[in-house]
């Protein structure tokens, strides 16, 4: 069972990681191509392109300028410990045991605009480059065209290594658009999380992001290996709804918070 998640805009490079064990991203050559494009952008360009404040644009212009492919554990951090935000709050990587971290490294993949597809222990430098960014590059007019079939092929390789052919999509639409589902060699399952509000169950972004992280952690903790095992997810008030579920979209509900 392979789990796909999105990265986070919020980063933590201050707190030391739980382990010094690390790996190198598979697509650093492509990352460097993108960095070289980004290094040509002024802070004003970045503010317009990414729709961010001048201060955030300036920070990321500096990050692009300082980025080098030969970074190490001394000035970088493993992705699973560097990313913060709602999904990662739900996943709570800081409480993983060594055995759980090993399973996470095997089963979890993080889609990234800059790095393509990350394993949890892959080292990253601070960056901001969302997958939906319309960054013109030598391969096209955006990052979806830049990555092409590369990430789909990488996911296929990773799911083949798992052996059961199940892909759990816990990524956002923006990031999963970098994958081409019709070329995936496996059963694609996209869980849906709905909270009760104003008289109906609906997807509430903040809660859904956290729930995706909690489900990813549940799969690791419980060593879930089947769709039926996934349906047993009952964390933080969520429960499986057979009535609202579709064959490849198991739906989980939660009452008003």
Curated annotation (Swiss-Prot):
Disulfide bonds: none annotated. PANTHER family: PEROXIDE STRESS RESISTANCE PROTEIN YAAA, PEROXIDE STRESS RESPONSE PROTEIN YAAA. HAMAP family: UPF0246 (MF_00652). This is UPF0246 protein SO_3540. It comes from the Bacteria. One of its GO terms (biological process) is response to hydroperoxide. Pfam families: H2O2_YaaD. One of its GO terms (cellular component) is cytosol. The lineage of its organism: Bacteria, Pseudomonadati, Pseudomonadota, Gammaproteobacteria, Alteromonadales. Belongs to the UPF0246 family. InterPro entries: YaaA (IPR005583).
